[in-house]
Amino acid sequence: MASDSRDRETACMLEFAVQMTCQSCVDAVSRSLQGVAGIQSVEVQLENQMVLVQTTLPSQVVQALLEDTGRQAVLKGMGSGRWQNLEAAVAILGGSGPVQGVVRFLQLTPERCLIEGTIDGLKPGLHGLHVHQFGDLTRNCNSCGDHFNPDGMSHGGPQDSDRHRGDLGNVCADADGRAVFRMEDELLKVWDVIGRSLVIDEGEDDLGRGGHPLSKITGNSGERLACGIIARSAGLFQNPKQICSCDGLTIWEERXRPIAGEGRKEPAQPPAHL
């Protein structure tokens, strides 16, 4: 089952690369995170241009705080603790429309999985979010298969015992069309979903309670807006890269360019979460 109650959430460790050149940079970064609810500890390493944050906040929120100092920040890894890396994954969502986003998965404990991310381009309101059976994008999101359901259950909400394992409930987009979320789930395991897909839908998931013929199948949440394959990603201290071997871009140059495609050759202004 999933949880989004702040007092029940499990803190994770976020590893950021932050452009810092002097002690005043360190002081500014430290002040930006000082006293922020949901941040439990901060370690700033000038020599490594690294900031470690133990927090229950979404990584996008912490990154925005760091970049409010006028310095670029790149999330390089996540972990459940400094000395433990169970498994981590990421899905980069896109489709034929304007919806795009990044969603990260982290196995906090053998029994508890963190799902957090930012999705842009949505209509304000609730949108169903689900892990689907296949990592097949040959027909955009229509080839992703049904909800991930190895237990043969009916569709339900993340708090229900009778639910698909891929049922993550709803995320809420604000007036600007951005959904920033963090949830924990006791059924989903990162190692079970790598290679599958994550899909965001056009409407609200009724959590199996709507009485519609699709309620117990899909939650009647409408068309699939955007999707991405769930792939392994770096845990803490597992991503030492400073320069991309494929094209020679530094992590700071990558921060201001698309992840792939022709646009990567020229500077571009990306969404803040990429």
Swiss-Prot record:
Job of this protein: Delivers copper to copper zinc superoxide dismutase (SOD1).
Q: Which UniProt keywords apply?
A: Chaperone, Copper, Cytoplasm, Disulfide bond, Isopeptide bond, Metal-binding, Ubl conjugation, Zinc
Question: What's one GO BP annotation on this UniProt entry?
Answer: removal of superoxide radicals
- Write down what this protein is called: Copper chaperone for superoxide dismutase
Q: Where does Cu cation 2 bind?
A: C244, C246
**InterPro entries associated with the record:** HMA_dom, HMA_dom_sf, SOD-like_Cu/Zn_dom_sf, SOD_Cu/Zn_/chaperone, SOD_Cu/Zn_BS, SOD_Cu_Zn_dom
Report the coiled-coil segments.
Answer: none
Say where the protein is mainly found.
Answer: cytoplasm
Naturally occurring in which organism (per UniProt):
Sus scrofa (Pig)
The record's subcellular locations are:
Cytoplasm
Which coenzymes or cofactors are required? Answer: Cu(2+); Zn(2+)
Its family remark reads:
In the C-terminal section; belongs to the Cu-Zn superoxide dismutase family.
**MF GO annotations:** copper ion binding; superoxide dismutase copper chaperone activity
Binding of Zn(2+): at which residues?
Answer: H147, H155, H164, D167
| Cross-referenced CDD domains | Cu-Zn_Superoxide_Dismutase (cd00305), HMA (cd00371)
Bridged cysteine pairs (disulfide): C141-C227
Give the position of the cross-link Glycyl lysine isopeptide (Lys-Gly) (interchain with G-Cter in ubiquitin): K76, K189, K216, K241
Q: Which SUPFAM superfamilies match?
A: Cu,Zn superoxide dismutase-like, HMA, heavy metal-associated domain
Q: How is the cofactor bound?
A: Binds 2 copper ions per subunit.
User: Domain HMA, which positions?
Assistant: 11-74
- Region (Superoxide dismutase-like) spans which residues? 88-234
Question: Which residues are Cu cation 1-binding?
Answer: C22, C25
Q: Name one GO cellular component term.
A: cytoplasm
Q: Report quaternary structure and partners.
A: Homodimer, and heterodimer with SOD1. Interacts with COMMD1. Interacts with XIAP/BIRC4. Interacts with SLC31A1(via C-terminal domain); this interaction is Cu(1+)-mediated. The heterodimer CCS:SOD1 interacts with SLC31A1; this heterotrimer is Cu(1+)-mediated and its maintenance is regulated through SOD1 activation.
